């Protein structure tokens, strides 16, 4: 399993690796910093997430709050099925602004 990272290239944030209780606290702060830098809409690309538990969902929701506070619309792309299922059983799926929904 890979160490988790968050990077930014322009308006795209890329999330990679394993999201769990060990990796999420550091990612939380890194993501908050990246969201606060700049302005305009962001896309969070989650296609590189290898594994996640409920801590990963909590991380996404926290970043959504950060983006809202910074007046930066955030769309989530490439949400892995494992994380989608966690959000679904937690009744939180409708809270996630998924890129796939934007085209529906």
Give short role names for the model-derived ranges.
Residues 1-55, 61-104:
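STAS-like cytosolic regulatory interaction modules
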